[in-house]
Design a protein with these regions (language model features):
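Beta-rich carbohydrate-recognition and catalytic domains
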Residues: 1-108, 112-268, 279-304
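Iron-sulfur (Fe-S) cluster-binding modules
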Residues: 272
Length: 304
């Protein structure tokens, strides 16, 4: 399991299962999953059946064949080339490039609350054609069952944020979008191609971006910030600082120290990944995947 996204269930939702809904998935999974709780410390209860199935996602549900005239998307190729280098010890537990291009799945939910229209919006990614993974959107009235839309929104690992009455997004590999006429338009690229999942936090004119990088040893949670007072085309990410690395056994610290690779990992490893930010009453929480993709943790985050 990986790619967490946490919300406090809004008041407009009736018959809520708990105070908090935590969304996540298997990296190559067949559904978006959800767990609910009344306390961030748990206990968490897994909702049976998930909240959106692959069949209902409008993504591919069967492995596609490679077109004769296939030309790989340049952006996604650079992202894969920058990070696909599995250690021999884990080669059997990481999808091959061909599997990455053909395995139907949906994952990496980004769930936000639209209070004005009283709905819950979820962005998610998966395979739309051979070798091409993209983000789409789904909507729900209760957060328990989502209706997906056909339109492609952007690249994978979408995170959405607001600044000065405009909506923006950030995705792999470092793409900044601005929502214009109801569409997310790419306006900048502020990272190298080795960035994986991210979490975002806006404070005044600063955008804090929490992320991890494929190939790091161990893969850890980093943070860079962006001065948004400038026009988006001039946004630039600061040098990263370390936020969190595996220190506990349940985070993977007792496992071999090896560089990470692009794509899923199907055994426990010495890595933390997939940061997400949740704020409640000015308290900032960092969610992240532990032992590679072998669990989800929550930590309090202090920003000086």
């Amino acid at each position: 399991i990986n790619g967490p996204s946490l919300i406090m269930v809004p008041d407009f939702v009736e018959n809520k299962l708990g105070k908090y809904y935590l969304y996540f998935a298997d990296h190559k999974g067949q559904e978006i999953k959800m767990a609910f709780a009344d306390d961030l410390a748990g206990p968490w209860t897994l909702k049976s059946g998930g909240v959106l199935s692959l069949e209902a996602s409008t993504l591919l549900t069967k492995p596609p064949k490679k077109p004769i005239d296939y030309q790989e998307n340049k952006t996604q190729k650079k992202a894969l080339d920058a990070g696909y280098n599995p250690p021999k010890e884990y080669e059997a537990h990481i999808p091959t490039r061909e599997q990455t291009a053909t395995i139907p799945h949906l994952a990496s939910p980004e769930v936000i609350i639209d209070s004005v229209n009283q709905k819950i919006v979820m962005y998610f990614h998966g395979l739309v054609e051979y070798g091409d993974q993209r983000t789409k959107m789904a909507q729900s009235k209760d957060g328990l069952s989502f209706i997906a839309e056909e339109e492609i929104v952007g690249y994978p690992y979408f995170r959405v944020f607001e600044y000065k009455d405009s909506q923006y997004a950030f995705s792999m590999p470092g793409v900044i979008y601005k929502k214009i006429n109801e569409k997310f338009i790419p306006v900048n690229n502020i990272f190298e191609y080795d960035v994986r999942h991210s979490g975002v936090l806006v404070r005044d004119d600063l955008l804090y971006i929490f992320y991890s990088r494929v190939g790091d040893k161990p893969e850890s949670i980093l943070m860079s910030y962006v001065d948004m007072a400038k026009p988006p085309v001039k946004w630039k990410a600061s040098e990263p600082v370390m936020v969190l690395k595996p220190e506990m056994d349940w985070e993977g610290a007792n496992l071999p120290l090896l560089p990470s690779s692009r794509d899923a990992i199907n055994v426990p490893v010495n890595q933390v990944r997939d940061p997400a930010i949740f704020v409640e009453k000015e308290v900032i929480y960092l969610l992240y995947s532990v032992r590679g993709e072998n669990g989800i943790a929550i930590a309090k985050l202090n920003i000086n």
